[in-house]
Amino acid sequence: MKQRHLKIWLAWAGVLIWCVLCLYLSSQRLADTTRLSAALTHWILGLLSLPGQTWYMPVFDGLRLAAHILVFAILAVLLWPALVLTTQNAHKSYLYSLGACGVLAVGSELGKLLIPGRHCSLPDMLLNFLGCLLGTGLTVLLRRRFAVGKR
């Protein structure tokens, strides 16, 4: 019994830590988020030995778009095991995970209305939700492939 409780706490701790990191990143001012994206863009250009004059903006823009998808895909992947351990219902946990991710996907964009220099973006909201769908789909595939969470 104690081991099950520990697994539940650890699963939810992972979700909470990820949510705090996401909240921190989405609450940054525009200058700060641009600086972080620029640093990552330079790192990627150097890693792939791409010329900055040609590739800077495509990589910068692609990175910012991919970040929306990746952040919420990871959240969905973290949420499912926490929910399945808590509810002990794997099938409903997919829906709960997708629903919770969807609410957070919309809420993170709406929260930007309160941050100076940031704006709420419907395309970003849709990218966030796409990440939720992809993450949930990935958990379905992983569960089928490795029989994780089957009882």
What residues fall within each predicted segment?
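Bulky hydrophobic segments
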Residues: 1-116, 122-123, 129, 133-151
